[in-house]
Amino acid sequence: KNYGNGVYCNKHKCSVDWATFSANIANNSVAMAGLTGGNAGNK
């Protein structure tokens, strides 16, 4: 399954397309917040 943010999974593992992932993170801090349990940007 491709999650559309550079992360995609098959039956065995998940992988990250870092170029896509990084571009999405730069444009969408919500994605990073989801991956970090909501801690991104909260200092």
Curated annotation (Swiss-Prot):
GO terms for cellular component: extracellular region. Disulfide bonds join 9-14. It is found in: Secreted. The keyword Secreted applies. Keywords: Antibiotic, Antimicrobial, Bacteriocin, Disulfide bond, Secreted. Remains active after incubation at 121 degrees Celsius for 1 hour. One of its GO terms (biological process) is defense response to Gram-positive bacterium. It holds the Pfam family Bacteriocin_II. InterPro entries: Bacteriocin_IIa, Bacteriocin_IIa_CS, Bacteriocin_IIa_dom_sf. Remains active between pH 2 and 10. Belongs to the bacteriocin class IIA/YGNGV family. Highly active against Gram-positive bacteria M.flavus strain ATCC 400, M.luteus strain CECT241, C.soprogenes strain NCTC533, L.monocytogenes strain ATCC 19111, L.inocua strain ATCC BAA-680D and S.carnosus strain LMG13564. This is Bacteriocin weissellin-A. It comes from Weissella paramesenteroides (Leuconostoc paramesenteroides).
